[in-house]
């Protein structure tokens, strides 16, 4: 591993650790073909929230993310799968909110039994929609992986660059957590990939969980 990757980005000592963690998760997601939205990060990073060095590099990082996103959107059937994926997410949220409101209504305002059963029905629909949403999310990732397996040279260097950025950000997170006396257990990371140095896996992906839960290792940890 090169010295540059192991060297943390220069940031102020009291850096926003949550912003740093979320950025790691965002970029790692692109490497696993889960496309998050970089927009919420753009203004903060450009303004120097994560230091001048990363602010200067952000343009290249974002351009690399967009290369992957643009390629993925050209995959056959991708748009229809995304629409279904989004619809299921919206349905799950709507059923959850409706069911929760009915439970509150039954508990505090009325004892109508049919409202109780209706709330349970909505919550059941929400659970079913969430399960299908998770299944479809994985199906999307598989379809994208199959595409890149067939086109292994496509943006290979871009993906390697982004992986190096994630690795360096992980070392950066560990450096500033140690500098500020923070407990890694209180700042876990959610990652789709686990092939990074300097992390410890706490939980592996499950049926409804597609990410690893990890914590960074500090310098004095094995």
Show which residues each predicted segment covers.
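Membrane-proximal, non-transmembrane alpha-helical segments
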Residues: 45-89
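Charged, low-complexity cytosol-facing tails and large interhelical loops of integral membrane proteins
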Residues: 6, 10-35, 150-222
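Conserved non-transmembrane functional hotspots
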Residues: 31, 36-46
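Transmembrane alpha-helical hairpins and terminal membrane-anchor modules
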Residues: 80-157
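Generic low-complexity segments that are intrinsically disordered, proline-rich and/or Lys/Arg-biased
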Residues: 39-41, 53, 77, 185, ...
